[in-house]
């Protein structure tokens, strides 16, 4: 950033109302500048980004994809969400923080501030069948 002289770590792109952003251009800029691309796909679950022969779901093109299952979203569980990534380091860090940053020991040791981001089982029971229906519908389009 020229004004603050700080390095930009990530760009967050928001796909709104089922419309995909121009991901090819953003991904190219991010890759060139070694910046992570994070997709907020809360309002675009089931949307495809298409370019020539490429057809990929929004939320799966950047380094991290974020989805929401709040009551006003495409699939609802009454709350919660989903994070997707193919970066092993990011996935491990997300799992660690999700379980209150507790180390895998027999005693309780927290090495940093963690969160309780686990969705209760009844909420999963509400959302899971809907996800299966969405997958079947998406496969026919």
Predicted regions and their residues:
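Catalytic PLP-binding core of fold-type I/II PLP enzymes
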Residues: 2-12, 17-53, 87-89
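Active-site region of PLP-dependent enzymes
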Residues: 43-54, 61-141
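Alpha-helix C-terminal capping/helix-to-coil transition sites in glycosyltransferase folds
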Residues: 7, 60-61
């Amino acid at each position: 950033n020229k004004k603050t002289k700080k390095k930009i770590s990530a760009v967050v792109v928001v796909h709104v109302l089922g419309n995909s952003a121009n991901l090819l251009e953003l991904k190219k800029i991010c890759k060139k500048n070694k910046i992570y691309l994070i997709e907020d796909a809360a309002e675009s679950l089931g949307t495809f980004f298409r370019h020539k022969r490429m057809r990929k779901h929004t939320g799966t093109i950047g380094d991290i994809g974020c989805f929401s299952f709040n009551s006003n979203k495409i699939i609802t569980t009454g709350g919660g969400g989903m994070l997707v990534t193919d970066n092993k380091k990011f996935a491990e860090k997300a799992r660690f923080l999700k379980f209150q940053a507790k180390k895998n020991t027999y005693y309780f040791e927290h090495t940093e501030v963690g969160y309780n981001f686990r969705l209760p089982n009844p909420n999963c029971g509400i959302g899971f069948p809907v996800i299966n229906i969405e997958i079947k519908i998406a496969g026919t389009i």
